Amino acid sequence: MRDARISPDGKEIVFCYKGDIYKVPVQGGTATQLTTQASYEANPVWSPDGKQIAFASDRNGNFDLFIMSADGGTARRLTYHSASEIPSAFTPDGKFVLFSASIQDPAQSALFPTGAMTELYKVPVTGGRTEQVLATPAEWVCFDKSGKNFLYQDRKGFEDEWRKHHTSSITRDVWLYDASTGKHTNLTNREGEDRNPVYAPDGNSVYFLSERNGGSFNVYNFTLNTPQEVKAITTFRTHPVRFLSISDKGTLCYTYDGELYTQEPNARPKKVNVDLVRDDEKEIATLRFSQGATSASVSPDGKQVAFIVRGDVFVTSTDYATTKQITNTPAKESGVSFAPDN
């Protein structure tokens, strides 16, 4: 599960699973599938009133913006450009959807003349002409309640966004943009990843994801008056926290190790147990072989044997009657061997 967003009223969460959009109550339970296309749907965002969801879909080739009822139904296409468009947020009045796309750099800006460096645009929810908001990359936009300012994460280079423990001059920072003056303020100016900012309900503090303190991505917080004074909200260690969002009442929502979590102010994280029902899951097949292995390798400790049957790699235990399929690809695997560390 990925691309999780909690609804403004804090009662539901939308997320992406296997290329479709789902919705589940914050208490957990059976998720409702909102899209059923053969295409890939992702990056859902809620309208301020919680009645609509905008998302990206590649059903026409590249990713375009679509909008639909939060209860499901027919999706309506909003953008038609050949570039891929990824939504960030609705404007607070609900009239526009902001999105990132590499459409056209203005003549006065030659800083990012490449498809990998997007610009920020908005499109009316009723459809129509798009309008450029910023000529520089601005991702994960989050407006304050007035609509005059918004937070965003920048992008300075081509580094993989999923890379962990990245430290350099091109790591992402959290910025504040004042639309009335056009001023950009860097709130987390350091050589480390800071991203995915969201306003707290009071509008005076910010939650964001960071790898500071030498660990994995976790949720942190600072006030706008003292952004240098950062407080850790979560302390996960093994895997990174991703896809941070917040409700109007301050309930945080994010993913950890592919699972959904919520967190109330001054409380511990709570896992959201989700039941997913799909009609395209493969039936479990039991395969039995007594011959036909094309190659085999014994692990350095002698406790496992890897072998290839029907073009896929399997591993079996010498101590237990357990065999596990390791690969499942259209290609034929060959030359199996164990690494020195087992």
Predicted region positions:
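Signature of short aromatic-glycine-proline-rich micro-motifs recurring in repeat-based ectodomains
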Residues: 1-3, 138, 288-297
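Mature N-terminal segment immediately following signal peptide/propeptide cleavage
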Residues: 1-26, 297
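Structural signature of eukaryotic scaffold interfaces centered on beta-propeller domains
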Residues: 7, 144, 200, 245-246, ...
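A flexible loop/linker signature enriched in serine peptidases of the S9 family
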Residues: 16-22, 36-41, 48, 54-66, ...
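Glycine/alanine-rich phosphate-binding loops at beta-alpha junctions
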Residues: 31
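Long, contiguous interaction/recruitment modules in multidomain scaffold/adaptor proteins
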Residues: 271-272
